[in-house]
Amino acid sequence: MNPTRQFVSVILVLIALAACTSSTPNAPDQSSGAVGPQQITNATEVIKFDPTSIAVSGDPASGTCAESSLVPGTHRCLPEGGQPTEPCFALGGTRLICRPNPVAGDYAVLISPAAPLPSVPPPSIDRAVIFFVELDSGLTCAIRAAAEPVVLDTGTAGYECATPYTYLVGDATTAFDDSAPQWTTTIYTLDPATGGAATGVAAGVRRVWIP
C-alpha cells in the first residue's frame, strides 16, 4: 500500500474513534453521592380515628344522641341522668363511645342510643376537626366540650390536657402551627389559687386524631 494512503487511513480511523468516544454519554459519577427521597423525621402524624380500635366493656348507659356541631362527623349524646358529652363515635347502630382517648385505649362513656342514630356523614378533609392530641412530651389533650369556657389572657381554651389546669388556647385551626412538618402548639397552665396562667410553653405535636 502507498505509505501516504496508509497514513491517511490511520488518521481517518483515529478520527472515527475519537468521534465515537466523544459521543458516548459520561457514566454517572459514583462519587457524587446522589441521594433519593429523604424521610422527614419528627413530622406530626395525622390519624383518622377508628372507634373499633378501642375495646369496650361493661353495660352502656341509655341516652339520646344527635349530630355534633363541635366535631363534624360525630355525635353529641346525653346519657340519662348525666351531662351532655361529645364527641361520640358510633360502633354500628347500637353503641357509641364518647370522649375516647386513643393513646390510652379507653373512653369516658359508653352509650346505648334510645332511638335510631341520625345519619352522620364523614366530614370532608377541610371540615375535619382535631379532637385529640399527643404532644412530644407524652402529654395528651382533648377538645373541650364543657359549657363553661376557660378564658385565659391569650384567648379561650379549646383543649384540656391530662395535667390538671393545663390547656391549649384556640380551636382546631388556631391552636396549632402547622407551617412545618412537625406542628407546634403552646401549653398554658393555670394557677388554681389565683386563676392566672403562667407564660405559655412551646411544645411539639407528635400525633393528632380526626374523625
Which residue ranges define each predicted feature?
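Bacterial signal peptide processing site
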Residues: T21-S23
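Bacterial N-terminal signal peptides that target proteins for export
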Residues: M1-V10
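Mitochondrial intermembrane space
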Residues: A27-P211
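C-terminal motif of bacterial Sec signal peptides marking the signal peptidase cleavage site
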Residues: A16-A19
